[in-house]
């Protein structure tokens, strides 16, 4: 009813709804941080392309699994130019998957794979999401696999370690639990995200990381406004 009440909107509905809302927000001149896998706006992973994204009025935060795994895949791609295939497998607690996530599983896979292609340059990719009903609830974690011939593992390890430090700047619970290893012709690594436990359960790190990514982008928008 009052579009002047804000300058920026966080949309955490569903992919199909955001496709409708995006046109309305654009007409109203409002920036949108899209937390659904709609593939409408520019894809953003703050540790990779934050500065590039603030020039766009509609920015997509990909998915929780994308925010977790793509930084590691990107770091590997920065150290290795001959990656043939990348696969990411994300596992989250069933209790942390709300109706929006469950309604958008196909969109989740498609958007995560699109983000993976865009950020790494590797066109042959696959994303898998597992909802684990175990009790007690598991922490959010992602495994990253990259098919590479004769990699420079020292360079890969250094690149990934640097990325983990960048991630911790805005996601304190981000942790490398299996550092990059090379076996059977592929690089494998695993990370997990433990939430802060302030508003959401600690096991819901998948929700914390996409929230933290969105807040980081919003803060960058605000800095840009203040500087100009």
PLM-predicted stretches and their roles:
Residues 184-194:
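Short, low-order "capping/linker" segments at domain edges
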């Amino acid at each position: 009813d009052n579009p002047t009440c804000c300058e920026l909107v966080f949309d955490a509905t569903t992919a199909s709804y955001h496709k409708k809302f995006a046109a309305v927000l654009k007409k109203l001149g409002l920036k949108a941080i899209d937390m659904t896998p709609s593939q409408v706006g520019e894809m953003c992973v703050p540790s990779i392309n934050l500065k590039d994204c603030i020039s766009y009025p509609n920015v997509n935060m990909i998915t929780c699994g994308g925010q977790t795994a793509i930084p590691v895949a990107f770091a590997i791609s920065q150290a290795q130019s001959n990656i043939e295939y990348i696969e990411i497998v994300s596992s989250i607690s069933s209790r942390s998957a709300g109706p929006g996530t469950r309604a958008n599983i196909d969109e989740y896979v498609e958007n995560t794979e699109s983000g993976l292609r865009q950020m790494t340059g590797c066109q042959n990719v696959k994303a898998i999401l597992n909802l684990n009903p175990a009790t007690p609830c598991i922490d959010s974690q992602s495994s990253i696999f990259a098919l590479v011939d004769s990699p420079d593992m020292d360079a890969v390890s250094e690149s990934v370690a640097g990325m983990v430090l960048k991630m911790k700047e805005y996601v304190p619970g981000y942790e490398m639990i299996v550092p990059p290893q090379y076996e059977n012709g592929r690089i494998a690594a695993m990370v997990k995200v433990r939430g802060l436990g302030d508003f959401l359960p600690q096991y819901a790190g998948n929700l914390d990381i996409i929230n933290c990514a969105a807040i980081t982008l919003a803060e960058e928008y605000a800095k840009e406004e203040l500087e100009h």
